[in-house]
């Protein structure tokens, strides 16, 4: 089977591309990074290193690559002939690649089945991509392609640390990964992908990841910054910070267990697995990188306010939210805007305009109380 992957960056090569190649796919990357594309075509393979003791390496290949900016005709042909298309380009870029995908779909054999999976850090990535692709098609084309093109949603999780290598193709990734795909979104047979998990309902896994990995990472960053530590590992190694992180994850865990039926002992083990990932010295990020974009992360449905709204009386989560509201790293544009808004309109203004809360909300009052202690 043929797989076309949009995005030859570290996540594309080190996570999605690696699994697809291990699963036996004929793999083609497409990207606009000329140096990476040229090197992939020259060598036909690349190295993936596990960011863990021993730093085990594997060679991924053979692979080929297409420069989407310089060779749109080759990209159209690659889309049309692919059995599986995946992306790791960032949510904002999906609408940019949509026109290229649409052009390829129009050129494919009418009976040829293609499934397209957006592997982005967002909810409903494939659905968003479908909407963007279909905006380039006529109603007649949309109707016809809906019979042969699937857009199954997915949840992905793997930390790829900031890294610099002499070899521009080498990529380091953490050993842990999770790629969960909604099997009900496929047209035709569900492909065999080693390491991927196929489920009937993706929502529990999306929320479990968002409210555990993303929430925990953010809390370690914001509380860590507040306490003056430099890295996520330092944060979770500091008892008072770890107490807030673990406490909040058990709060979100209670919601996840009650709502989706996860077994308590299994979810508790999942929390500890996530904490251990944060402790990994090989992938420890600076708190200021993980904390960046606080306005987005304090959004009504994001990793902090989102789970807090679903609970009656969160304690540790509110401590973390208070730390996020105080985040003032001068080199972070959103942090500067956040503190400007806080100075002009107070915490009340931030809670209403950024967090989507109102004074009648219990959470609004609880956060207000925590920030004015």
UniProtKB/Swiss-Prot annotation:
Residues given in the record as NAD(+) binding sites: 3-14
Pfam families: Mannitol_dh, Mannitol_dh_C
The EC number(s) this enzyme carries: 1.1.1.17
Keyword Metal-binding among UniProt keywords: no
Catalysed reactions, semicolon-separated: D-mannitol 1-phosphate + NAD(+) = beta-D-fructose 6-phosphate + NADH + H(+)
One GO term of the biological process aspect: mannitol catabolic process
InterPro entries, per database record: 6-PGluconate_DH-like_C_sf, 6PGD_dom2, Mannitol_1_phos_5_DH, Mannitol_DH, Mannitol_DH_C, Mannitol_DH_CS, Mannitol_DH_N, NAD(P)-bd_dom_sf
One example GO MF annotation: mannitol-1-phosphate 5-dehydrogenase activity
Transmembrane stretches, start-end: none
Claim: Oxidoreductase is one of the keywords in the record: yes
Entry GO terms, CC: cytosol
Enzyme superclass (EC): oxidoreductase
Keywords, sorted A to Z: NAD, Oxidoreductase
Entry-linked HAMAP family: Mannitol_dehydrog
PANTHER family: ALTRONATE OXIDOREDUCTASE-RELATED (PTHR30524:SF0), MANNITOL-1-PHOSPHATE 5-DEHYDROGENASE (PTHR30524)
Record-stated family: Belongs to the mannitol dehydrogenase family.
Protein name: Mannitol-1-phosphate 5-dehydrogenase
Gene of this entry: mtlD
């Amino acid at each position: 089977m043929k797989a076309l992957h949009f995005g030859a960056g570290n996540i594309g090569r080190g996570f999605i591309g690696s699994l697809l190649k291990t699963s036996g796919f004929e793999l083609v990357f497409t990207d606009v990074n000329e140096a990476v594309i040229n090197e992939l075509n020259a060598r036909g393979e690349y190295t993936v290193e596990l960011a863990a003791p021993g730093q085990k390496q594997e060679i991924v290949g053979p692979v080929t690559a297409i420069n989407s900016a310089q060779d749109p005709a080759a990209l159209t042909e690659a889309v049309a002939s692919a059995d599986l298309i995946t992306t790791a380009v960032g949510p904002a870029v999906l609408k940019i690649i949509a026109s290229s995908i649409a052009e390829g779909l129009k050129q494919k054999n009418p009976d040829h089945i293609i499934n397209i999976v957006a592997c982005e850090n967002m909810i409903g990535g494939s659905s968003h991509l479908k909407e963007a692709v279909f905006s380039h098609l006529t109603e007649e084309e949309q109707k016809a392609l809906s019979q042969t093109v699937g857009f199954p949603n997915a949840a992905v999780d793997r930390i790829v640390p900031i890294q610099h290598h002499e070899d521009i193709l080498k990529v380091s990734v953490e050993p842990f990964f999770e790629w969960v795909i909604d099997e009900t979104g496929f047209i035709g047979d569900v492909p065999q992908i080693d390491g991927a998990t196929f489920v009937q309902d993706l929502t529990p896994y999306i929320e479990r990841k968002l409210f555990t990995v993303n929430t925990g990472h953010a809390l370690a960053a914001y509380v860590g910054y507040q306490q003056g530590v430099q890295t996520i590992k330092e944060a979770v190694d500091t008892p008072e910070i770890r107490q807030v992180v673990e406490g909040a994850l058990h709060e979100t865990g209670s919601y996840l267990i009650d709502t989706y039926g996860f077994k308590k002992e299994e979810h508790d083990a999942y929390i500890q697995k996530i904490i251990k990932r944060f402790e990994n010295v090989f992938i420890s990020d600076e708190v200021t990188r993980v904390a960046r974009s606080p306005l987005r992360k304090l959004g009504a449905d994001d990793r902090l306010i989102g789970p807090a709204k679903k609970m009656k009386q969160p304690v540790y989560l509110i401590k973390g939210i208070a730390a996020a509201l105080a985040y003032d790293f001068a080199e972070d544009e959103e942090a500067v805007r956040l503190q400007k808004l806080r100075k002009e309109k107070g915490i009340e203004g931030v809670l209403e305009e950024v967090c989507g809360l109102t004074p009648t909300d219990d959470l609004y009052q609880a956060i207000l109380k925590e920030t004015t202690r």
